[in-house]
From Swiss-Prot:
Claim: Transport is one of the keywords in the record: no
Remaining remarks: A single active site specifically recognizes both ATP and CTP and is responsible for their addition.
Domain of life assignment: Bacteria
Protein species of origin: Staphylococcus saprophyticus subsp. saprophyticus (strain ATCC 15305 / DSM 20229 / NCIMB 8711 / NCTC 7292 / S-41)
Protein name (record): CCA-adding enzyme
One of the GO BP terms on file: RNA repair
Catalytic activity: a tRNA precursor + 2 CTP + ATP = a tRNA with a 3' CCA end + 3 diphosphate; a tRNA with a 3' CCA end + 2 CTP + ATP = a tRNA with a 3' CCACCA end + 3 diphosphate
EC number: 2.7.7.72
Matching InterPro entries: Bact_CCA-adding_enz_type3_sf, CCA-adding_enz_C, CCA-adding_enz_firmicutes, NT_sf, PolA_pol_head_dom, PolyA_RNA-bd
One example GO MF annotation: ATP binding
């Protein structure tokens, strides 16, 4: 069975082979192909060194030359081509002290994390599976390549990656792999938080997140991770896939007495803003008890975010985060109110701060922001029409 992404990348392998180098597809793309899952990225491994790769191809980018990786540009697409390599000792549970380029496929794949990721495939779709990765896929088993204690001692991130794969695929952890994860979990404290968060983002969004999250709790993994170590994760249950930012917001909302710094997660400013918005939304959702309060709530937070939070209502209740009044706040009422709102943002108001300053004949100050907010709410609640002459009259009676 062919695959369009592999077919598109075939000329890369053909050109390397034409120059007498070995070349194979490897890793996640081969695994996903064998599992009939969508393939997103193609990784190519070769006996050619970085210098030789650059000699073979006209357009290249040396994105990871020291690790043997060169980006090859072909027909507008970029392909990661990595030299067969072996690794020296690991001193910090994160990265090898040395990388050695080798000429043998077996030497390359034996350094990989899990058997299902150590499968290579040639240009004719012939499989090279030295560690029974296909059997483990068939039996839905996550097993390390070789000794699991050695694999996790080399790079503790493999523990989180293994649990991420469990969340995505629903596979079981092979017994020795499970035991080694438990034995080495404390080593994740040596990892950069950014690397951990990359895996956690995929983990919380997995279809089988419950199984994986329970293992994280069993391993007491969170006590070794910045930000999360301040929370009592045993109190939190995660049964359904959700974005990482939503998970963090729910955890903060559940344990508001904890004063942890979101900045410790090293996520983007947009993600931090998203978390804070969701926390504020959850804080206020219980206060919505009337139709007029619902109007203001929908105006402030928007239909999209409110409906997202409501889609996790079971998780919110299971974790005792909220006691929403379902008769007032539900998908139908939120959608209806959103349709009826006279405006969606302050930019649509038919009056602005300059107008109000002229009416009041006062200097600007905190009062102006408060007045603009009052005008907003008056429009949303239907107290006044969003029409400048009417708004001016309304403001005159209040400043």
């Amino acid at each position: 069975m062919t695959n369009s992404l592999f077919e598109t990348a075939k000329p890369i392998l053909e050109k390397l082979q034409a120059h007498h180098f070995q070349a194979y597809f490897v890793g996640g793309s081969v695994r996903d192909y064998l599992m009939n899952r969508p393939i997103h990225d193609i990784d190519i491994t070769t006996s050619a060194t970085p210098d030789e790769i650059e000699t073979v191809f006209d357009k290249t980018i040396p994105i990871g030359r020291e690790h043997g990786t060169i980006n090859v540009i072909y027909k507008g697409e970029q392909y990661e081509v990595t030299t067969f390599r072996s690794e020296g000792d690991y001193d910090d549970h994160r990265r090898p002290n040395e990388v050695f380029f080798v000429r043998n496929l077996y030497d390359d794949v034996q350094r990989r994390d899990f058997t299902m990721n150590a499968i290579a495939m040639d240009i004719n779709y012939q499989i090279f599976d030295y560690f029974e990765g296909q059997q483990d896929i068939k039996h839905q088993l996550i097993r390390t390549v070789g000794n699991p204690d050695e694999r996790f001692d080399e790079d503790a991130l493999r523990i989180i990656r293994g649990l991420r794969f469990q969340s995505q695929f629903g596979f079981h952890l092979e017994e020795a792999t499970f035991t080694a994860m438990l034995n080495h979990i404390a080593d994740i404290k040596y990892l950069a938080i950014e690397r951990i968060v990359v895996e956690l983002k995929k983990l919380t969004n997995g279809d089988f997140v419950s199984k994986s999250f329970n293992n994280l709790k069993h391993f007491m993994a969170f006590k070794y991770i910045p930000f999360f170590k301040h929370y009592d994760i045993t109190k939190f249950t995660l049964r359904n896939a959700m974005p990482f930012t939503t998970f963090v917001a729910f955890l903060i909302s559940q344990q508001r007495e904890i004063d942890a710094n979101i900045a410790d997660l090293k996520v983007s400013n947009n993600e931090k803003k998203r978390i804070k918005t969701l926390v504020q939304l959850i804080d206020q959702i219980d206060e919505v008890q009337t139709k007029s309060q619902l109007k203001l709530f929908v105006y402030d937070y928007g239909k999209k975010d409110i409906l997202e939070v409501l889609s996790y209502l079971d998780e919110l209740k299971r974790n005792r985060i909220t006691s929403i009044s379902p008769l007032i706040v539900n998908d139908q009422t939120v959608t209806e109110v959103a349709k009826q709102l006279p405006m969606l943002s302050r930019s649509e108001m038919d009056i602005n701060g300059k107008d109000i300053l002229e009416i009041a004949n006062k200097k600007s100050g905190p009062w102006l922001k408060e007045t603009l907010r009052e005008v907003e709410y008056a429009i949303i609640s239907g107290e006044v029409v969003n029409f400048k002459p009417e708004l001016k009259k309304w403001v005159k009676t209040r400043v």
